[in-house]
UniProtKB/Swiss-Prot annotation:
The gene is mepA. Residues 227-274 are annotated as: Disordered. Zn(2+) 1 binds at H110, H113, D120, H211. One of its GO terms (cellular component) is outer membrane-bounded periplasmic space. This is Penicillin-insensitive murein endopeptidase. The keyword Disulfide bond applies. It comes from Escherichia coli O1:K1 / APEC.
Length: 274
C-alpha cells in the first residue's frame, strides 16, 4: 500500500474518531428548565433552546452541522441584536456556531461554546440575503491585513463598527473576542464613548467574525462566570503587546489534557449517551 493510501486511511479513521465525540451523539436538547452548567470551556446545558432558522433579521450558516442551540438568553440576544441591526438598515446578521443540543466539547474548532452562552457572528452585513448554497458554504471576509497589524481599509465599514458596539452595549454580554487588529481599529474609531470597549477583547484568529459571550444566567447556579475584563478601554499597552514579536525562546504551550467534566455534565452524558 503506498503512502498516499495510508495517509488517506489515517485521515478517514481520524475523521470517524472525531465524529464519535459523545456530545455529538445527543441530537436533541435535554428536557428541563434551562441551566448552563460549568465553564465556557468545560460544561454543558440542560433545556437548550433552538434558534429559529427562519428570520427576517438574521440568517443561520452551516445548518447541516446543527450548532444552533443555546440558552434561551442567547437566543433572545441574537434576536434582539439582529432586530436592532435591521431597524437601523445595516443589513442581515449572519449567525455562525452557537452550541450543540446539550452543549459540551466539540470535535474541533472550538474550545468554548460548551454552556449555550457563546455565538460566532460574521463581521459582514449583506444587504441582499444569502442563498441556501451560500449559507451552507459561507465565504468568510478576512478584515485583517496579511501582516496582522491593521484592518484592510477597503473592507472596514462603519456598519461593522456599529455591529460590534451594539453587541458590546447589550446588558447580557460580558465579552466579545475579535482579532487584535480589529480591536485596534475600534479603539481608533470610538471617539469619546468608550465604556463598551472594555468588553471587546483581542484574541487569536477572529479575523472575519466576532465571538460573543454572555454572562451566566442568574438561575444557572452551577454556571461558572469569568472574572470581569480589566478596567478601562483595553486600548493601551495590553493591546499593543499583541503586535510585538514573540520573545526569543518562546514555544507553543503543550496541548493540555481536558479536565474532568462537572459532575452534572458527566451524569447527563451517562444518562443520555449509550
Amino acid at each position: 500500500m503506498n503512502k498516499t493510501a495510508i495517509a488517506l486511511l489515517a485521515l478517514l479513521a481520524s475523521s470517524a474518531s472525531l465524529a464519535a465525540t459523545p456530545w455529538q451523539k445527543i441530537t436533541q436538547p435535554v428536557p428541563g428548565s434551562a441551566q448552563s452548567i460549568g465553564s465556557f470551556s468545560n460544561g454543558c446545558i440542560v433545556g437548550a433552546d433552538t434558534l429559529p432558522i427562519q428570520s427576517e433579521h438574521y440568517q443561520v450558516m452551516r445548518t447541516d452541522q446543527r450548532r444552533y442551540f443555546g440558552h434561551p438568553d442567547l437566543v433572545m440576544f441574537i434576536q434582539r441584536l439582529s432586530r436592532q441591526v435591521s431597524n437601523l438598515g445595516m443589513g442581515t446578521v449572519l449567525i455562525g456556531d452557537m452550541g450543540m443540543p446539550a452543549g459540551g466539547r466539540f470535535n474541533g474548532g472550538h474550545a468554548s461554546h460548551q454552556t449555550g452562552l457563546d455565538v460566532d457572528i460574521f463581521l459582514q452585513l449583506p444587504k441582499t440575503r444569502w442563498t441556501s448554497a451560500q449559507l451552507l458554504r459561507p465565504q468568510a471576509l478576512d478584515l485583517v491585513s496579511r501582516d496582522g497589524k491593521h484592518v484592510v481599509p477597503a473592507l472596514w465599514k462603519p456598519e461593522i463598527f456599529s455591529l460590534i458596539k451594539l453587541a458590546a452595549q447589550d446588558k447580557d454580554v460580558t465579552r466579545i473576542f475579535v482579532n487584535p487588529a480589529i480591536k485596534q481599529q475600534l479603539c481608533l474609531d470610538a471617539g469619546t464613548d468608550r465604556d463598551w470597549l472594555r468588553k471587546v477583547r483581542p484574541w487569536f484568529q477572529h479575523r472575519a467574525h466576532m465571538h460573543v459571550r454572555l454572562r451566566c444566567p442568574a438561575d444557572s447556579l452551577e454556571c461558572e462566570d469569568q472574572p470581569l475584563p480589566p478596567p478601562g478601554d483595553g486600548c493601551g499597552a495590553e493591546l499593543q503587546s499583541w503586535f510585538e514579536p514573540p520573545k526569543p525562546g518562546t514555544t507553543k504551550p503543550e496541548k493540555k489534557t481536558p479536565p474532568p467534566l462537572p459532575p452534572s455534565c458527566q451524569a447527563l452524558l451517562d444518562e443520555h449517551v449509550i
